[in-house]
Amino acid sequence: MSKRGTRTPGYWYDNTPIPLPARILAPVYGAAIALRRALYRRGWRRRHRVPVPVIVVGNVTAGGTGKTPLTIALVVKLQEAGWTPGVASRGYGRDDAGTARWVEADTPVALGGDEPVLIAWKTGARVRVDSDRLAAARALVEAGCDIVICDDGLQHYRLARDVEIEVVDGQRRYGNGRLLPAGPLREPAARARDCDFRVVNLGQASATAAPQVPDDAGFGEWQMRLSIDSVQPMDGKRAQPLSMLAGQRVHAVAGIAHPERFFAMLRARGIGVVPHAFPDHHVYRAADFSFGSRLPVLMTEKDAVKCRPFADEWLYSVPLKAELPAAFWVSLLDRLNKLASRQGV
């Protein structure tokens, strides 16, 4: 992978001044995306449908909000319900972004992208990376999938969809409320009202948050909890309970959109964290782990798939599980079953 990762501009989420070039470019960007969406809504650009239900998971903000844990949870739940889901993804950060390919658990991250490889590794589902999400969806259907999950595809209007799920960071929300590059918004925040479901990633904080009750149509702020309870040695040994590290110091590594969230989850389990934050989608080298002290190194699974070539007995991945209310799954599966009956799937 040639990309070295991405960092979020601070002014998106705090009160620091927005650079003048960003303020000038934001209205231009806004006009362009408004025109593009209008072309699709009025039928001047065609949306293409595949013969199975399509779920789009995405967000109106740039950067990570928890889409990958939710996508993994969706795949697993659909598999349990008897579906054969496939995942369509762009495969951000891979070296040959113009090449479409199947991604499996052992696909090099440089070819498949960190998130698609993680999804394939965790679920065993068919995963197709392609800059053309429609082509990816068609390939998945041809491969026998009876439902397609389009990861990070909210703005990919060429692919018609049956269900849209918006994922929101429960702490940052929509930041300063401005469009790119002055703020984090890919589209105006009002775009989220068109989505069928809104999943709010509250991390561990959701354990004390008041529940939100969605309306009868299924739309509402469904809360997603992220939980950790084990560590997986990256040298192939059996997983161990995370509690075995309580009271110990560890190096914690996170190359994700919001590294502090991962560090806070470890601290909440009584672990002494020496934090090491890297840019989102960072490409790791063995030298990145020369910390000067020999302590266990804990990292997210998204980071772990990129460190497999040089893993040793000191490296551990921390499985992350997305938990949503039972009512969310009932509402979603009911909608999908109705769609399938109409489409003859």
Curated annotation (Swiss-Prot):
Family matches, as InterPro entries: LpxK, P-loop_NTPase
One function term, GO molecular function aspect: ATP binding
Binding sites annotated in the UniProt record for ATP: T61, A62, G63, G64, T65, G66, K67, T68
Catalytic activity: a lipid A disaccharide + ATP = a lipid IVA + ADP + H(+)
Enzyme Commission numbers on file: 2.7.1.130
Function field: Transfers the gamma-phosphate of ATP to the 4'-position of a tetraacyldisaccharide 1-phosphate intermediate (termed DS-1-P) to form tetraacyldisaccharide 1,4'-bis-phosphate (lipid IVA).
PANTHER family referenced in this protein's UniProt entry, alphabetically: TETRAACYLDISACCHARIDE 4'-KINASE (PTHR42724), TETRAACYLDISACCHARIDE 4'-KINASE, MITOCHONDRIAL-RELATED (PTHR42724:SF1)
HAMAP family: LpxK
Family: Belongs to the LpxK family.
Annotated protein name in UniProt: Tetraacyldisaccharide 4'-kinase
Organism: Xanthomonas euvesicatoria pv. vesicatoria (strain 85-10)
Lineage: Bacteria, Pseudomonadati, Pseudomonadota, Gammaproteobacteria, Lysobacterales
